[in-house]
Structures are given as structure tokens and as C-alpha cells.
């Protein structure tokens, strides 16, 4: 019955099941470990395991199991029998296990058998296997054979290490009596008195032995030390002798090497100087010979690559010359595939870039003379001017005078371009008569080539009257029309041209080229002449794109007096306009000159390599450009001298200058004590240098004769200078960037009874010619001509004046140069003196220094053929930060005396003494009063205090967020519109200014919702502005301007465009446009537009 219950409790399995048996034993063990009696069924199960048979069955399940009773006295206790039976059961169930030592032995035997088997396998391996596998097998075989030796070595090493670690100091351990263990103690052995004597004797003996050992050890140490020092000294002496001998041999060797290198350097220096002299003198034959002798790898590589380039360009130009133009229009569609090799990367082999005929040319050249590095240049030059025509006399149609010899040469060069079906650039220096040479070309083609035109002349608006006057003077028989004026006037001109159909020349300006494209593009122009061609240096401009893609033109000619800048991109832009199908990728154009050094880590160039690259670049453009300078062709033209006159600033100017540098605001006469916050701090500092009236409102009374002079250092200098120049018989051209300043100058000239004329961007086109005629009359009563640099510095003939005053210099020195050449040109009979007014220690000195750097060769950075004369926005920002840090500390320092200024201004000794006498008379008349306004005379409202927020910021004005341009009325050159939008607007006759402003505002409103980062900068600007800003006043004026009639609006936009004409001098700075309620944005602009913004703003106020 117990078996049945056990079977039921254990899942109904049989007793012989080992799993159930094990479970029963584990269950019994749990009871016994807790000192509990086994249940009957479990006891039966364990007993059956021990005896091998089940016990007697019990009764049915309804019979309860017997209760445990106490065992009889004559039997063993219940627990003893149970434990014995349990142990026997465990023994029966326990497997026959091996002992630990036996298992280790078995494991060792197994490892040995494996090793032996592996040894036999390795020994039986054939030797025909690979070398790597054979080497690995041999290493493994030797390692297994040396296993026992390795074990012995490890045992010996570990034993030795243990001994050295534990028995390092044997002598000290010998005398360490604590380590001695005697077999028996001394106590109780022998007589106590004898033991005491023995102890004393033993101590004495031990002490003697110890002292002897110490002495011996000390002697040994001393001997070893002396021996060591002796060896060291001997080694030092030997080492010193060796060093001396080595140094002597090294000196002898170095002296010889240095002498050899010195001779080589002298030889290389002489060769380099000879090469540079040959290169500067443009003696190519001698330079190539010297390069071959020097065996300079870099120079040879550069020459070979550029020689191949020139050969390829010559072949391409020849194909263009041979191309037949459909209907006389310059569309080289058939030659697109022939020119595709010029667009291929330079990394490909040259033979892959050339057509078959070019490969034959190159191979034949290499076979004839592989070292002729000038062959490519000869092919290039011969391909361009292959058809020559000698011009010895001027056309008979020219009636206004006789051409000079160099002008005849220019005419011959332009005729050569015409005969060779090419375009070019006439880049004579300003004042050499580019206009007359161009008119002579038109007359020559009309008279000798039978080319009546039509000719399209595109020029700045300021020089249109000059073109018309020159045509009327020199070739009155040629029908030249001026296409300008309001919409009704232009419409009448179009009807007249369309009705008669007889005209030779049409003269217009840049704006109408884009605005009236719908009409002008219908005419097939034979020649297009672009005056001031540097406007096309940016090939991405709307003007360049319009002229290239919108007009049908057979020939092109550029006129520019500005020298070609050392910029590959600008150079390529001009070539792209002249030959758009040859120079059609600026990237490939740069790669042509970068390729020789593309695979080298060192791309820095020497002076010779820089000069060589410049010469090779000029060789590319030289056949298309003709440039002569005044000192080369006009030997008898009077000289031009530039004098920098430095002046101090008045106390009012210094107050405003300090306020701008410290707080970015100036005090105004508002009655409320508020000040005016400013933007574009560089422009504000320049206004401080000119006159404090530029900050005051229109209600301020400027008609104060003493104050208008004493408030400005420059006006004070003018007040001393002008009477002297008028008495000496000189006439003056005064140029300024700011039209508001010209307004103040007009007040000063009126107060002092000086007769003057004025020309700026607001002057009408028909009035400009009249103003020039009035000033250039023989007995003209006008003493001074006031001109804005942008509008009056281009194409005006004012050689009747012999003095030029640059009131405030331009960032771009070319603008000042052009302004100076209005007087220094053909027809000038007097020495021209140019006075540049500069406030001492101010931002104007920085501007002047930057202009000098740009004019010099040191401002050019050349790396692997790349030319860069621009400074980055970071450079401009650092310059402004330096000015702000310097503040007013250097204002008024090193101001020249009156005598020094007289010495600089006088052109003769008599003039100097006359100026001295006039100064003395003036000083006596003024009773030696101070010429400039002092601190106590500055109006109280001119001072401003810091706001609470500025005080919290320790008065440090954060100028970094407001160094941008002022908001000016947007002049549209259609760059803000897409090509499709612009074409639609032009053909439909819409106002491009209004359309562009509408699209611009839409973009700004969209960007305003997306850009959240600009809010912090806007808030910073708001904290600096307490009163009405100058930009808000300008916006109100713009709104009033929009209400003008259509006639006035068209005229104003045209004149403001003329005022804003300028070339990009590449000086980019950070600009923040005016923050207004509806939009805010920031952008990047060109630094030269500082003056453009000011000039344009002044014209609007005017």
C-alpha cells in the first residue's frame, strides 16, 4: 500500500525509475536535514531502495497510517536504523568515482598522448607544402619537443627569483639572532657564574668580529668607489678626445659643404636675378634660355603646361576666326563640339583634350624642338593677329582735329581685331582719348570697310553728353542718336529710328539696355562698344547676362581706364564677354594655372613664380587688350602730385566721435534730451570727420558763417586754402562721397561769395553737358566744381582745372584715381596738384592706408596661380574693432603747422611766401583767435548720456550687431528677380524698381517667419535706440517719393542708379539692414558701397 501511495505521490511512475528514485532520496534528505521524521510512504520508498524489495502492502486508503510509537527497549532507535539504511542507499546509488589525484594523472596522461600524436603528425607531414605553412609546422614541432626543457627552465628561474627575493641580504640575516633557533635553552645548564663569563666573552668576540666585518665592508666599498670613479674619469677623457676629433672632422666637412653651397647659392642667385631681369623686361627668349640652363623643375613644368594651353587656345581662336557666322551674328553653334576639349579636366592626358589636328600640331612641334617653350605663345599670337593692315592716316570723316601717333596705333590695333574677326579691350589710361579712338574706328569702318553700322554704345549716364559732343565735334556727318530721357521721349526716338531707319550710332546707358531690351534686341547690331567695361567684371550681373544672351551682336569692344586686377575670375569675366565660347568656364580657367602644382604638397610660390604666372596670364589676354599709360605716350603732359593734408578735429567733432565709438549714438537738438542711434559705425565715424552738421536735422540753422567753419577741421583747412588758391589763379575740382556734405559745402561757398557748379547723381543728363561747357569756357567765372565721386568721377573732361581736392577718400582707390584724372588728361597745360584731406588719428587714416595697400603689389596673395586682392569680412570687422578700441586717444595728434601746409600746397617759392603773408594777415585780422570750436562752445544738446541698460552693461557698446549698412532705396538691376520674371517684366514695360521691391519684401517677410535667431539681435538694436532713427526718416521720404508723378519717379530712379554705379572692389563686410516693423534681415555687401549708400542717401535728401 505504501508503494502504491509512493507511486501516486511520485506521478504514477514505477519504482525502478531512476529519476523518481532520486527524487525520493532528495525528499528524504530534506526531512532528515531538518530533524523531522519521515512520512510512512517515504520511509517505505527508501527502505525498498535499500532492501531491493517492497515492504508489505498496507491496507486500503481509508485505513489511516499507524502513528509512530516509541521503539521497544530491546531494539535500536528509530533514527539509527533510518540513518544506516539511508547511508547504504546512498552508497548503492553513488557511481564509482575516481579520486582527485587519479583524475589529474588521467588528465596528464591524456595531454601527453595528444602531444605525442601531434608530434607524430607533424613529423610525417610532407615537405611539399607552402613555405608559410611549412614554417608554422616547424615552429609548432620544435615547441612541442622542447616542452620539458621549457618547464625545467621556468622552475629554475622561479626558484632563483624566490631565493633573491627572500635571501637578498645574507650578511644581515646571519647576525640576526632572532632568526636562530637553538635546540635547547641555556637555562639550567652549567654554573651561573661561568655562564656570565661566557656571555661577556661571547659578546666581546661578537663585537670584534662585527667591527672587523664592518671595516672590511667599508674598505671594499671605498675601493669599489675609487675604482668606479677612476673608470668614469678615464671614460670621460676618452669621450672628450673622441668628441674633439669628431668635431674637428665635422667642422672640416661642414666648412667644405657650406663653401660648396655658398658657391651654388651665388650661382643660383645670379641666375635668378638674370631670369627676373629678363622676365621684367619681357625678354622671353633670354628667359627661356636661362630656365633651360637652371634646370628648375617647377618653372619648366609651369612653362610647359602654359605653353600647351596657349597652343590650344590659339587653335581654338583660329577655328572661331574661320567659322562662318550665320547672317553676320556671333553665334558659334557649329563650333561648340570643337571647343569642348577646353572644358575637359586638366587631369586627363593632353592628347585626350585635343582634336586630331591639334595632336598633330603638338607632336610635330615636339619632334622639331621639344624644348621650345615659346612655340605655344607664337602660335597663339599668330593665330589672333594673322591679318595685318597698316593705318598711317586718320579717316577723312574726322573733322574735329588730328589724331596723335599713339591714337593712330590704337586705331590700327582695333582694325586688326576687326579684320581677324575678334573682339578686344581698349584699356588706355584715363585721359588718353579712348572716346576719340573709338569714334575714329567707326569712321574708318564706315569709310574704308563699308560698314555703316548700326553701332551700339553703352556708357555710364554721366558721360553720355560727352559722347554726343565728341560725335558732333569730330564726325558731324555720322548720324548718332542719344537714346535717353523719359518714357515719352524714348518712345519718340524709337518711332523716329523705326520710321527713318537711317542711323549709324545709338548711344545709351546701362539701365536702358536692360529696361528697353524689348526694342533694342530687335536690331542686329554690328558693333557694340561698352564704355567703363570694368562693369562687366562680374559675369553673374544682370548687365553681363543681358548683353551676352539678349542681344544679337557681331563684334564687341570694351573701353576701360581701370587696370585689370590680378583676379582670375575678373579676368575670365572679361574674356568670357569677348569670347564666350572659348572662355566659358571659370573653374577650368583656374585649373589651367593650378594644374602644374596640383600634385605637390607645397603650393607656396616664389617671387619669380608669381611674376611668371602673372606674365603668362597677361600673355593670354595681351592679344585682346591694348593699354598705354600717360608717361609712355604723352611725354609733355604736365605731372600730377598728390599731397595728403592732415587736419585736426573740432571739439564738436571729437564729442560726436567719442559718442559713436563708446555708445553708437549722438546727441541731437530735439528738445527732449534724446539721442539718435546709429548704424554702420564706419560710415558714422567718417561723417564725424567731415562735419557735425551731417547729424543735425533740417530745422537747424546752418547759415552761420563762423560756426560752419569752426565746427569742422576740414572746413577750417579749406577756409585757409581756398583764398590762397583763388589768389594764385588755380581752379578746383572738389570730390566727396556724401551729397549731404556737398549741400553744406554749397552753404559755405555761398556765404564766402565763391562761384561754383555742382554735379551729382540728381543732375539731369542734358544738364551735365551744359555744366561742363560752362566750367570749361575760356573766361569761366566759376572757381570751383563740386562733384560726387560716383557720378562725377567717370568720363568727364575738366582739364581746365589744375587742382583736385578729395574731401573724403573712397575705400576703392580706383575711384579716387578716376576722379583725379578728370583734370590730369590730354589738354592739361598746368601741373595738377591733388589734395587729400584726412583727419589725424581717425578712421580716415585707416581707409587711406588700406587704399595704399590695395594699390601696391604687397596686397596681392598668390597661391598656386590664384590671385586675391580682397580682404574678408572678418578683416573688415577686426579693423572696425581696432578703431573702436582706439577711440579718441589719437585724435588731433601730429597735426601739421600752417607753414608745413603752405609748403605742401605751394607749387613755387613765390606761392609759398604769398601763402605765408596771407596767413599772417588773416591771423592779425582774427586777433589770433582759435580757429576750431572749443569744448565750452559745443552745444549742450550735442552731449548724450548713457541709458540705464548701457550702464548695466558698464557702458560697453556692442557694436558688432550694428556694423551694417543703412537702409537705402533699392536700385534694381533685376538680380533679385528670376530670369523668367525679369523677361516678362521687361517685355510688358513694368517698373522694375517697384517689382523688385515687391518680390524682395515678400522674400523678407517669408524669411522673417522662419528665422527666429535674428530676434535677439533685433532686441539688442532696440535697446540702443531711444529716439527716431535716421532710417525711419528715410523710409518716410521714400513713401513720399512713391507719390511723385511717373516722370519724376523714372528720372529719380535713373539718377540714383547712376549715383550707385561702382565696381566691386571685393571688400566684403557684414551688413545689417535697417530694422523695421515688418521685416528684418542681414546680408553681406561690398565695402565700397559705404560711399554708395551715403551718396544715394544724400541724393534722396536733396
UniProtKB/Swiss-Prot annotation:
Binding site for ATP: 428-435
Span of domain Helicase ATP-binding: 415-581
Tissue: Expressed in root endodermis, cotyledons, young buds, developing cauline leaves, rosette and cauline leaf stipules, sepals of young flower buds, stigma and seeds.
Annotated GO CC locations: nucleus
Span of the signal peptide: none
SUPFAM superfamilies, per database record: P-loop containing nucleoside triphosphate hydrolases
One GO term (biological process): response to heat
Disrupted gene: phenotype observed: No visible phenotype under normal growth conditions, but double mutant plants chr12 and chr23 are embryonic lethal.
Gene3D superfamilies noted in UniProt: P-loop containing nucleotide triphosphate hydrolases, Tandem AAA-ATPase domain
Compartment list: Nucleus
Catalyzed reactions: ATP + H2O = ADP + phosphate + H(+)
GO molecular function terms attached to this record: ATP binding; ATP hydrolysis activity; helicase activity; histone binding
Positions of the UniProt region annotated as Disordered: 55-76, 1002-1102
Functional description taken from the UniProt entry: Probable chromatin-remodeling factor that is functionally redundant with CHR23 in root and shoot stem cell initiation, and root apical meristem (RAM) and shoot apical meristem (SAM) maintenance. Plays an important role in mediating the temporary plant growth arrest induced upon perception of stress. May promote seed maturation and repress initiation of germination.
Stored PANTHER family: SNF2/RAD54 HELICASE FAMILY
Record-given protein name: Probable ATP-dependent DNA helicase CHR12
Annotated source species: Arabidopsis thaliana
Designated gene of the protein: CHR12
Amino acid at each position: 500500500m505504501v508503494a502504491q501511495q509512493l507511486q501516486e505521490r511520485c506521478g504514477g511512475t514505477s519504482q525502478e525509475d531512476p529519476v523518481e528514485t532520486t527524487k525520493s532520496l532528495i525528499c528524504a534528505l530534506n526531512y532528515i536535514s531538518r530533524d523531522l521524521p519521515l512520512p510512512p510512504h517515504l520511509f517505505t520508498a527508501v527502505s525498498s531502495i535499500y532492501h531491493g524489495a517492497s515492504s508489505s502492502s498496507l491496507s486500503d486508503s481509508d485505513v489511516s497510517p499507524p502513528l509512530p510509537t516509541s521503539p521497544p527497549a530491546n531494539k535500536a532507535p528509530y533514527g539509527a536504523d533510518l540513518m544506516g539504511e539511508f547511508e547504504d542507499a546512498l552508497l548503492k546509488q553513488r557511481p564509482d568515482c575516481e579520486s582527485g589525484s587519479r583524475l589529474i594523472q588521467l588528465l596528464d596522461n591524456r595531454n601527453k598522448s595528444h602531444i605525442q600524436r601531434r608530434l607524430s603528425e607533424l613529423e610525417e607531414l610532407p615537405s611539399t607544402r607552402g613555405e608559410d605553412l611549412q614554417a608554422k609546422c616547424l615552429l609548432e614541432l620544435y615547441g612541442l619537443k622542447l616542452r620539458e626543457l621549457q618547464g625545467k627552465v621556468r622552475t629554475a628561474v622561479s626558484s632563483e627569483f624566490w631565493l633573491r627575493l627572500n635571501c637578498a641580504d645574507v650578511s644581515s640575516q646571519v647576525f640576526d639572532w632572532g632568526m636562530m633557533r637553538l635546540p635547547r635553552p641555556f637555562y639550567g645548564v652549567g654554573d651561573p657564574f661561568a655562564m656570565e663569563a661566557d656571555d661577556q666573552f661571547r659578546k666581546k668576540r661578537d663585537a670584534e668580529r662585527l667591527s672587523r666585518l664592518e671595516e672590511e665592508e667599508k674598505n671594499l666599498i671605498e675601493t669599489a668607489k675609487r675604482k668606479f670613479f677612476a673608470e668614469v674619469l678615464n671614460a670621460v677623457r676618452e669621450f672628450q678626445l673622441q668628441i674633439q676629433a669628431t668635431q674637428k672632422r665635422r667642422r672640416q666637412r661642414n666648412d667644405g659643404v657650406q663653401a660648396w653651397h655658398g658657391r651654388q647659392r651665388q650661382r643660383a642667385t645670379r641666375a635668378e636675378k638674370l631670369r627676373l631681369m629678363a622676365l621684367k623686361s619681357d625678354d622671353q627668349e633670354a628667359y627661356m634660355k636661362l630656365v633651360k640652363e637652371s634646370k628648375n623643375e617647377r618653372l619648366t613644368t609651369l612653362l610647359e603646361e602654359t605653353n600647351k594651353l596657349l597652343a590650344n587656345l590659339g587653335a581654338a581662336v583660329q577655328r572661331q576666326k574661320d567659322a562662318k557666322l550665320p547672317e553676320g551674328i556671333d553665334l558659334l553653334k557649329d563650333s561648340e563640339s570643337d571647343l569642348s576639349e577646353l572644358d575637359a579636366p586638366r587631369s586627363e592626358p593632353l592628347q585626350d583634350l585635343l582634336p586630331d589636328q591639334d595632336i598633330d600640331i603638338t607632336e610635330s612641334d615636339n619632334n622639331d624642338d621639344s624644348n621650345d617653350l615659346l612655340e605655344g605663345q607664337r602660335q597663339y599670337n599668330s593665330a589672333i593677329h594673322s591679318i595685318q593692315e597698316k593705318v598711317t592716316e586718320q579717316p577723312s570723316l574726322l573733322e574735329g582735329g588730328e589724331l596723335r601717333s599713339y591714337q593712330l596705333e590704337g586705331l590700327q590695333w582695333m582694325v586688326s581685331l576687326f579684320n581677324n574677326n575678334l573682339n578686344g579691350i581698349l584699356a588706355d589710361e584715363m585721359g588718353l582719348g579712348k572716346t576719340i579712338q573709338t569714334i575714329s574706328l567707326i569712321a574708318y569702318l564706315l569709310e574704308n570697310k563699308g560698314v555703316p553700322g548700326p553701332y551700339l554704345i553703352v556708357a555710364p549716364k554721366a558721360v553720355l553728353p560727352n559722347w554726343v559732343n565728341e560725335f558732333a565735334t569730330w564726325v558731324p556727318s555720322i548720324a548718332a542718336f542719344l537714346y535717353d530721357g523719359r518714357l515719352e521721349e524714348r518712345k519718340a526716338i524709337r518711332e523716329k529710328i523705326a520710321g527713318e531707319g537711317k542711323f549709324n550710332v545709338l548711344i545709351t546707358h546701362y539701365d536702358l539696355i536692360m529696361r528697353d531690351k524689348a526694342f533694342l534686341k530687335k536690331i542686329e547690331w554690328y558693333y557694340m562698344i561698352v564704355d567703363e567695361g570694368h562693369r562687366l567684371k562680374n559675369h553673374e550681373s544682370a548687365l553681363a547676362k543681358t548683353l551676352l544672351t539678349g542681344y544679337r551682336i557681331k563684334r564687341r569692344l570694351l573701353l576701360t581706364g581701370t587696370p585689370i586686377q590680378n583676379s582670375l575670375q575678373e579676368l575670365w569675366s572679361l574674356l568670357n564677354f569677348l569670347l564666350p565660347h572659348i572662355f566659358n568656364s571659370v573653374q577650368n580657367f583656374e585649373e589651367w594655372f593650378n594644374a602644374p602644382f596640383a600634385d605637390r604638397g607645397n603650393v607656396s610660390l616664389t617671387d619669380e613664380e608669381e611674376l611668371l604666372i602673372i606674365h603668362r596670364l597677361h600673355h593670354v589676354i595681351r592679344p585682346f587688350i591694348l593699354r598705354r599709360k600717360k608717361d609712355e605716350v604723352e611725354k609733355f603732359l604736365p605731372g600730377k602730385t598728390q599731397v595728403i593734408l592732415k587736419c585736426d578735429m573740432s571739439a564738436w567733432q571729437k564729442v560726436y566721435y567719442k559718442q559713436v565709438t563708446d555708445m553708437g549714438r549722438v546727441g541731437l537738438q530735439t528738445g527732449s534730451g534724446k539721442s539718435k542711434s546709429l548704424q554702420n559705425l564706419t560710415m558714422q565715424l567718417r561723417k564725424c570727420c567731415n562735419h557735425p552738421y551731417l547729424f543735425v536735422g533740417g530745422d537747424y540753422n546752418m547759415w552761420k558763417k563762423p560756426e560752419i567753419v569752426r565746427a569742422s577741421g576740414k572746413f577750417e583747412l579749406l577756409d585757409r586754402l581756398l583764398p590762397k588758391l583763388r589768389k594764385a589763379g588755380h581752379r578746383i575740382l572738389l570730390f566727396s562721397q556724401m551729397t549731404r556734405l556737398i549741400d553744406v559745402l554749397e552753404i559755405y561757398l555761398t556765404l564766402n561769395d565763391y562761384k561754383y557748379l555742382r554735379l551729382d547723381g540728381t543732375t539731369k543728363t542734358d544738364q551735365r553737358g551744359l555744366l561742363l561747357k560752362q566750367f570749361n569756357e575760356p573766361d569761366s567765372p566759376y572757381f570751383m566744381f563740386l562733384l560726387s565721386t560716383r557720378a562725377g568721377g567717370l568720363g568727364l573732361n575738366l582739364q581746365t582745372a589744375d587742382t583736385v581736392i578729395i574731401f573724403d577718400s573712397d575705400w576703392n582707390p580706383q575711384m579716387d584715381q578716376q576722379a583725379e584724372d578728370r583734370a590730369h588728361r590730354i589738354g592739361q597745360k598746368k601741373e595738377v596738384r591733388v589734395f587729400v584731406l584726412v583727419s589725424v588719428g581717425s578712421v580716415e587714416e585707416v581707409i587711406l592706408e588700406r587704399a595704399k595697400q590695395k594699390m601696391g603689389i604687397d596686397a596681392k596673395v598668390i597661391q598656386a596661380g590664384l590671385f586675391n586682392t580682397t580682404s574678408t569680412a572678418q578683416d573688415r570687422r577686426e579693423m572696425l574693432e581696432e578703431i573702436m578700441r582706439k577711440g579718441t586717444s589719437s585724435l588731433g595728434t601730429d597735426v601739421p603747422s600752417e607753414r608745413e601746409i603752405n609748403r605742401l600746397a605751394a607749387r613755387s617759392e613765390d606761392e609759398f611766401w604769398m601763402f605765408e603773408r596771407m596767413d599772417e594777415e588773416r591771423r592779425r585780422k582774427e586777433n589770433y583767435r582759435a580757429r576750431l570750436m572749443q569744448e565750452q562752445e559745443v552745444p549742450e544738446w550735442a552731449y548724450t548720456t548713457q541709458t540705464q541698460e548701457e550702464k548695466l552693461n558698464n557702458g560697453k557698446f556692442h557694436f558688432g550687431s550694428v556694423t551694417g549698412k543703412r537702409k537705402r532705396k533699392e536700385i534694381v538691376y533685376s538680380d533679385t528677380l528670376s530670369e523668367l520674371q525679369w523677361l516678362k517684366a521687361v517685355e510688358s514695360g513694368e517698373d522694375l524698381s517697384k517689382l523688385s521691391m515687391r518680390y524682395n519684401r515678400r522674400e523678407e517677410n517669408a524669411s522673417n517667419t522662419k528665422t527666429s535667431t535674428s530676434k535677439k539681435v533685433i532686441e539688442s538694436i532696440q535697446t540702443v535706440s531711444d529716439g527716431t532713427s535716421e532710417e525711419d526718416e528715410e523710409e518716410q521720404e521714400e513713401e513720399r517719393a512713391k507719390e511723385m508723378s511717373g516722370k519724376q519717379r523714372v528720372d529719380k530712379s535713373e539718377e540714383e542708379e547712376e549715383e550707385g554705379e561702382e565696381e566691386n572692389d571685393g571688400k566684403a563686410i557684414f551688413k545689417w539692414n535697417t530694422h523695421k516693423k515688418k521685416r528684418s534681415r542681414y546680408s553681406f555687401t561690398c565695402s565700397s558701397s559705404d560711399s554708395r549708400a551715403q551718396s544715394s542717401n544724400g541724393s534722396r535728401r536733396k
